[in-house]
Regions:
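Conserved structured core elements
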Residues: 1, 40, 57, 61-64, ...
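Short, flexible active-site loop motifs that bind/organize anionic cofactors or intermediates
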Residues: 33, 53, 195, 217, ...
Length: 299
């Protein structure tokens, strides 16, 4: 309940015309605590509902920033803005390339054709994700501070892999080096994924998903046996182009890009491997990319 409370608090502080109470009933099918942005969905939905109800002309980007502020200042998680941004600016059958430093963004079509996005749920709630997110953020900031003694940069995202390889030795802790390596290499993979989608090169896109998961596992260390089993067993299924964990890690979900004729094979093979390894079954959702938050009249 703190997510709507946070949005309501900040809206009331900013807009004095919100003078009356209201009843809100939430209905949805996003699993809670599954790294599918349920909290950001509640934040943006609540904000959109209240601003519509009270005829407040609030810029969509400001609402997105307010959602992040709820996470940072009301909930106490030092999270980024990606979840709120995609829910605020999502476009049907498109991905978004977002620079979180400048908030500059570009849409790119996701014309997967006969390939579908499958979400694989570990059915294990995230218990460490929020504290570990803050820990990883702090580790990246420590690595950046050491690199800044030799490079004129404001963020790890400004550093190329070639620069990192030349200056990695200045980071005096091996763990911090791996954290920085993940952030920098993931930034490069994201740009490559954007170009692959533009070129309809889904084989390369799938390979980037696989490489991303490997980096999240080995360098950033935010996966765990459940997510690794899902992603790695999915990667072996014929008809799967790629798979990786999604969200904050440690539990929650992974995604796979799979040929529509191989979806049942994916479910069967992954379920068998996951149940044998973890002891219980995962869940699967097959989804399409939809528009962001909107009123029912806009659907």
């Amino acid at each position: 309940g703190n997510y709507p409370k946070g949005i309501i608090r900040f809206l009331v502080e900013r807009y004095p015309q919100i003078e009356t109470g209201f009843n809100i009933i939430y209905e949805g099918n996003i699993p809670n605590g599954a790294s599918l942005s349920s909290s950001a969905s509640i934040e943006l939905l609540t904000g959109h509902l209240i601003t519509t109800l009270f005829h407040i002309n609030m810029n969509r980007l400001e609402l997105v920033k307010m959602g992040q502020r709820v996470e940072n200042d009301f909930i106490g998680v030092n999270s980024g803005i990606m979840d709120q941004f995609i829910i605020g600016f999502g476009k049907k059958d498109h991905a978004i390339l977002l620079d979180t430093n400048t908030l500059e963004y570009h849409y790119v079509p996701t014309e997967f054709g006969t390939y579908k996005i499958s979400i694989m749920n570990t059915n294990k709630r995230r218990e460490l994700a929020e504290s570990k997110y803050n820990e990883r953020r702090a580790e990246c900031e420590q690595a950046l501070a050491q690199l800044q003694q030799h490079l004129d940069v404001q963020s790890l995202g400004e550093i190329t892999m070639a620069q990192f390889e030349a200056y990695a030795h200045v980071i005096n802790d091996e763990k911090l080096r791996r954290r920085a390596k993940h952030a920098i290499s993931e930034n490069a993979r994201t740009k490559q994924a954007y170009e692959a989608l533009k070129a309809h090169d889904f084989d390369t896109f799938g390979q980037l998903l696989n490489a991303s998961h490997a980096s999240l596992k080995d360098d950033y260390e935010v996966t765990g046996i459940e997510l690794d089993t899902l992603a790695e067993s999915a990667q072996k299924v014929e008809g799967v182009l790629g798979a990786r964990m999604t969200g904050a890690g440690f539990a929650g979900c992974a995604i796979a890009l799979v040929h529509q004729d191989k979806i049942k094979d994916l479910e069967r093979i992954v379920t068998e491997e996951y149940t044998r390894t973890v002891g219980y079954a995962p869940s699967f959702y097959h989804v399409d990319i939809a528009n962001g938050v909107r009123t029912l009249e806009e659907v």
